Structures are given as structure tokens and as C-alpha cells.
UniProtKB/Swiss-Prot annotation:
SUPFAM superfamilies: Terpenoid synthases (SSF48576). It catalyses: 4 isopentenyl diphosphate + dimethylallyl diphosphate = (2E,6E,10E,14E)-geranylfarnesyl diphosphate + 4 diphosphate; (2E,6E,10E,14E)-geranylfarnesyl diphosphate = variecoladiene + diphosphate. Dimethylallyl diphosphate binds at R478, K556, T557, Q592, N599, K609, K619. Hexamer. Its EC number is 2.5.1.-, 4.2.3.-. Mg(2+) 1 binds at D92, D96. It comes from Aspergillus aculeatus (strain ATCC 16872 / CBS 172.66 / WB 5094). This is Bifunctional sesterterpene synthase. Mg(2+) 2 binds at D92, D96. Variecolin and its derivatives produced by employing P450 monooxygenases from other fungal terpenoid pathways exhibit anticancer activity, thus, the skeleton of variecolin could be considered a privileged scaffold for developing anticancer agents.
Amino acid sequence: MEFKFSAVVDPSTYQTQGLCDGLTVRYHKNTELEEIDCLRCQEHWREQVGPLGLYRGGLGHPWSGMSIAIPEALPERLGIVSYANELAFLHDDVTDIAKYYQGDEHNNDLKAAFDQVISTGTIKHAGSGKRALQAYVAKRMLSIDNDRAITSLKAWSTFLEKAGRQEDYRFKSEDDYLKYRVHDVGMLFWYGLLTFAQAITIPENELDTCHQLATTAYLHMALVNDLVSWDKERQSAAALGKDYVTNFIFVAMEEHAISEDQAQERCRREIQKATVDYLRVFEEVKARDDLSPDTKRYLESVLYSMSGNVVWSFHSPRYYTDASFSERQLEWMKNGIPKAQTSEGGASGVDQGEVKIHDRTINGHHAVTSNGTGTGSHDTLNGDGTAHENNSRDASIPGRTTNGISNSDTSLLSAVLQAPYEYITALPSKGFREHAIDALNVWFRVPAEKLAIIKSIITILHNASLMLDDLEDGSELRRGKASTHMIFGLGQTINSANYQLVRALQEIQKLGGPKSLLVFTEELHYLYVGQSMDLYWTSNLICPSINEYFRMVEHKTGGLVRLFGRLMALHSTNPVKVDMIDFSNRLGRYFQTRDDYQNLVSAEYTKQKGYCEDLEEGKFSLPLIHLLQTMPENHVLRNVWMQRRVRGTATHAQKETILELMKRNGSLQFTEDTLGILYGHLEKSIGELERRFGAENFQLRLIFELLRNG
């Protein structure tokens, strides 16, 4: 294995008690990266969860845990794996301190959060405690290496499913205990850390073999942990009123009726045996030609994890009260980590300047305001929040209401009226807007009842707009299924979509106060203005400028974002008042530009909506606007586009022709570059909001990172 980021440690500078003889110890050259992120994790824990007390984690002097156990971690990944490991230490201490029968609850919660981010791309309730920190870990890992991050998150979820599940079981034999301990030590957790840190990919067909070969190494690390943590675990057990300790030393004492010292010596012999056994395993691995280079690199890296774990453990303040921290670590603990390293959100290496084409800028935004009410940031809640009952019962006529329609008739009519809406609502959705609302509520702290109403309003309007969009655009597919009007026809679809405005208005009334209604009508107005611009250009073959295009996007796509942002600001319980207009407009521009790009290049999008659907519908998307403006005299382009108008649609061959012109002319690359800049603007807005609110929003950053990589 090639060594780029570490150096061999002089054996005279550390002690091992003979527990890793024959193994080399290496140490990372950039250990300050670990120190910064371990301390950052502790800061986040204090902010999000609570005080740490006398907590000791992965840091120490002269050796810190990740720098010596994964010495070849890529420098840009060392920080986040150190943060993740520190979070694991904090979680471990919580489950130790809690009543032992509650340990599963903590593991279940962490597992559920990892499962959520894998399956849905977000972590719900990330504004509370540990889940906010998990969202932070996931976001940073996904931003570095999406595929390996997902692999690690899946491995950690599986580990949490098994870890700590027998803490209330009194093991009778060493064999039974060791079988359990190999998994509980975090074989899969360490696998996730190590593969991500060193950018290793184990082929699927070699995964089981890899874990089997590494079992002895993980047993080694488990027993080292049992040896050095014996006093700590024994004290925790006594504090919890337990008469047993889930530790090899305790099991050996009971099984063989031996003293504590004898059991510790027995543990050392098992560790030494595991060292010899794994060295033999690795020698055999090197001679095999049926294993990939990455599998071999992983199994070799585990050697350094074994030796590093021994050296760190014997010098760690986590296990030894006389162990120390470095002067730099103590300085940062006292005064905070370097300010240049405190935020992950601002610059992303993307040029923050404007993108220009033919002197048309796409950076300017149109702030939507009306009579000074462009934001609800300084509004106060008026009214009692109750909805008026418009359909009171007429007691003299059973089964009737005062409007003369029977309840049974109303129910039937409602079912017919709602059927198209319920059809589109039942189609699979990633729920981006709902996740974004949850993330923003980390700042706004809108009461749960009002937040549910805001979500309901946005869901109703979003699905209604999709029904009308598909109908107006002639789209036959929505989320891989037949569009609503292809099932229910034009009339029923239009009627049901329009009725949703009534439902949304009824929901707005539940929020109480006139300002909610004002925000609602303003943003609904702009949403329809944006849609009309889009339809007008398509119908009349008018190619807008890029500025005009983004003005339309801010109305049409940004409208719903502004609506929920302004409603949340209006009903916020946070005393900090912030204008969400700029953020909402930037999100709208990014979201629509991404949609334009995905429509042309994404296989998944083709499956859900059809091949290059925007070209088929004649929409002026950003790539097409760029193409038409940079090739205004191209006869092939002009004639293909005119034929699409004549036919009312575009054939597969015509779409292929336009797509090829986009590739040759750089229109797709322009759109991709624009996305990078728009994402930079979005990150800048998030950073500004974090500074205004005085709190980082890991969940929001995770959502956008997944959106960028999705």
C-alpha cells in the first residue's frame, strides 16, 4: 500500500504491552483536522443536546484516535470521519449512562435516522438533539463522496440494529461473548469509517469474504477496548445497580472462577493470539489473486487500525485519568476552534460571481413585495386561529344541513370532486417541500399545529399546480404513471384542481389573522403570473431572455417556497425576525434550473416523465434559451423547432437532433456551470440565515446536498 498522508511512529515513543507485536504504527500528518472536528462535534452536542460534563472522546496527546487508527485517511475526509467517531463516543456514553434497558431506544433512534436519510434523503426532526448532528455528518459525507457515503450510512444502520442488544444478558462463556462482541465493537461501523476515509470500494461479491477475513482483527480491537475500558465499565455497571459487566474480563472471571488480574492476563493472551492470527491471514491475502486491490488495501489498512487502537488506548484520556491533551487541544477547548474552521456552509469553491451571456445576467433576483408586505418577518399573530363553521346543522331536519344538501350527498359529491386530486397525491413523491419546511422550522419554531396547516396548504397547492401543469403542457406521464387528465379527462381534472384553491383557502383561515390571507393571495397571484408567462412563450414561439426566464421562475417555482417561508416567518415563535425572500428566490432558480437539466440528461427523469419531455412540449428551458441565443441563424435548429410547432409535438429523432446541438454548442455545459453558481448562491443564503438566527441548520444543508447529488 502506498503511504501519502502518514509517517511511521518511533516505537520508543509508545507502549503496547506486547499487544500488537509485529505491527507498524503510523500517524497522520494532519492530525489538527481531527482535533478541529472532534471539538466541533462536542460544540454541536452542547448546543443541540446538552452539557458534556467530564466527557473524554477521541482526542489525546501525543496520539488522537482517528489519526493513528486510520493514518492514511484522505485529508479532506479525516475531519468528518473524526466527527462521526466522536459522535459515536458520545452516543456510547449516553447508552452507558442511561438505564441499561433503555440502550436499545437510543440505538433505534440513531438507526431510524440513518434509514431515513438513505431512503428519503432527509432526517426528520433533525432540529432535535442527536438527529441534527447525524444530519450534519450525512450532509458533509454526501458532499464529498455520495456513493461511499451511502455505503457507510447503510453499514452504520446495520451495525446499530445489532449493537448493544444484549447488554442486559449475562454471558456464561467466553465463546458466546466473543461472537457477540465482534459485532458490537462496530465491525460495520469501522468498515463504514475506513472505506469512506480512504475512498475504498469493496466489490459486492467480495463483501462477505472481506468481513470474514477481517473478523480476527475486529476481535483484536474489541478485546483491547474491553481491557482498557474495564474500570470505566465496571463503575458504570455499579452505578446502574447491575451485578454483572458486559466485558470479556467479567465473563472470564465468572466462567473460570479466576481473579480480576488473572482475567485481565487472559484477555491479553487472547489479544496477542489475535495479532498472530491476523498477520497470518493477511500474508495469505497478499498471495491471493481472487481479491480486488481495494479489498486487499482495506485488509491491510485494518492492520494499522489494530496497532493504532492499541497505542491510542494506552495513552487516551478517555480511559486513563493521568493521560493528557496537547497544548493546542487545551487552547481550542478553552477558546474555541479556529474561526476559519467553524462553518462548513459558506464558500464551496464555486465562483460566487454572475453568469453572463450576451450581457444578460442570471444573478439578479426579483424580490416580490406588495405594500411593504414582502415578508412576514415583523408580522404579529392576530385572531384566535379558529375557523368559522359555515355549514351548521339544522336540528329540525335529520340528516340535513342549512344549505339543503344531505350529508350523504355531500360525501358522495366530495369523493367525486376529490378523486383526481387523491390520484396524484397517491403517486410516489420525494416530499422535498415538506422536508424543507421541517428543516426551516429548526429556526422558526412554528407550533406543531400551525406547522401541519402550513404543510397542508403547500401540499394542496403543489399537487393542484401539477394537475394543471400536466394538462396545459400536454404531459402524459407524472412520476412514472399516467397524468391525472389522462385518467379523469380535462373537465374533471380542471374542476378538481380549481377546487383545491378553496381547500387551501379554508386551511389559511385556520391559521387566523388577516396577514396570512394577504401572504396567501400575493404568492398565489405571482404563481399564476409565472405560469402565464411560461404558457405565453410556448404558445407564441417567443424565446425569452435569460433574465425574463428567471423572472418567470421566481414567480412560478419560487412562489410556493416564498409562501411557506413567509407563513412560517409570520407564525414563528423565534424572536429573531428574518426576511426569507432572497433565499426563496434563489432556491426557486436553482430548483427549476436543475429540473431543466435533469429533463434532458437524467435516465430516472426519462422513466418518470418521458424522454426530453420539455422539448416535446416546446418549453423554453434554460438549455434551449442558451442554444437559441447562441445559434440564432442555425437553419437546422429553426426548422426542427418550427416542425415541432406544426406537429404539436417533437419526434424522438427531432429531440435527438436538438439534444446533439445542445451538446456541441455547450448549452448543457452552460446549464451545468450555471447550476454550480446557483448552488453557491443558495449556500451563501443559508450561511447568511445561519448567522442571523445564530444557529447552524444541518438538516437544511443535508437536503440541498442530496438535491445536488440526486
